[in-house]
Amino acid sequence: MTETFQHISVLLNESIDGLAIKPDGIYIDGTFGRGGHSRTILSKLGPNGRLYSIDRDPQAIAEAGKIDDPRFTIIHGPFSGMAQYAEEYDLVGKVDGVLLDLGVSSPQLDDAERGFSFMKDGPLDMRMDPTSGIPVSQWLMEADLDDITWVIREFGEDKHARRIARAIVEYRENEENEPMVRTGQLAKLISEAAPKSFKEKKHPATRAFQAFRIYINSELEEIDTALKGAARILAPEGRLSVISFHSLEDRMVKRFIRKESKGPEVPHGIPLTEAQIKELGSANMKTVGKAIKPSKQEIDMNPRSRSSVLRIAEKL
């Protein structure tokens, strides 16, 4: 029997409002998930509007198959391929809005078989697309101490990174231990490795699990490529609406929008003519409003929305 997992779209109205949807516009939802944002966009489009949604999770693609609408197209792949897909559909410079809802969806977290959560025991996998790449369990068996430490520190911002990495390496080198292939095994190991002085409200494994997930899915590289792709394919006055869920993601989005809003930097001390400065280009986007966070009411209804941040930009 297949278990059904509910997903509540975070900052749904705010992110859709940020797109300033035109009834006959062309839109891209880079993260279909379970379709909350896509269905809302479709409800605001007229007969000539178009929505292209992207996801690399086969379960999301199956969910998208339930939408029978000639205005809707689902694309199976990573959102980093957005610019490529836009070229294939002749959409470059014609897209009126791009939505990116970053991170893991609730169904992915709640389905123990996907291996994303330390709260439910399941196979130690964590791949967004289980048909490609390697599971976390395999990487942890092969990576050296320094690599594991770097991943936990870089992507989990965990000050106990070395201690956790050492515990993982020592565990796998002990031939008496069972192979570490379950999320429960890893969560228990990290909890035991945490110092007795650990006082954070979060579970000791929270940051390490986030780090492994980000690394195994190349999430930050995916986001960087997707943001650049979105800036390229948007039409003038097209909107970019991005929801992030942790500080690493939000910093990337904030810096990207700031950089695109400033335009290229003119090198100091190098005399340039006005024509040469013009050749360097100008600002590509502008920030729309301030960063938006969920209301207390939304957080009460959906505690997972607590860390979310929405940023909106417009193509010039």
Curated annotation (Swiss-Prot):
Domain of life (superkingdom): Bacteria
**Which EC number(s) does UniProt give?**
2.1.1.199
GO BP of this protein: rRNA base methylation
Q: Which coarse location class describes where this protein primarily resides? A: cytoplasm
Q: Which Gene3D superfamilies does the record associate with it?
A: Putative methyltransferase TM0872, insert domain, Vaccinia Virus protein VP39
Record field: catalytic activity: cytidine(1402) in 16S rRNA + S-adenosyl-L-methionine = N(4)-methylcytidine(1402) in 16S rRNA + S-adenosyl-L-homocysteine + H(+)
Keyword line: Cytoplasm, Methyltransferase, rRNA processing, S-adenosyl-L-methionine, Transferase
Where is S-adenosyl-L-methionine annotated to bind? 35-37, 55, 79, 101, 108
InterPro entries the UniProt entry points to: RsmH, SAM-dep_MeTrfase_MraW_recog, SAM-dependent_MTases_sf
Q: Which SUPFAM superfamilies match?
A: Putative methyltransferase TM0872, insert domain, S-adenosyl-L-methionine-dependent methyltransferases
Q: Which GO terms describe its molecular function?
A: rRNA (cytosine-N4-)-methyltransferase activity
Q: Which GO terms describe its cellular component?
A: cytoplasm
Q: Name its cellular compartments.
A: Cytoplasm
| A Pfam match | Methyltransf_5
Q: Which HAMAP family match?
A: 16SrRNA_methyltr_H (MF_01007)
Function comment: Specifically methylates the N4 position of cytidine in position 1402 (C1402) of 16S rRNA.
* Family note: Belongs to the methyltransferase superfamily. RsmH family.
Q: What is this protein called?
A: Ribosomal RNA small subunit methyltransferase H
The protein's organism comes out as Vibrio parahaemolyticus serotype O3:K6 (strain RIMD 2210633)
Q: What is the lineage of its organism?
A: Bacteria, Pseudomonadati, Pseudomonadota, Gammaproteobacteria, Vibrionales
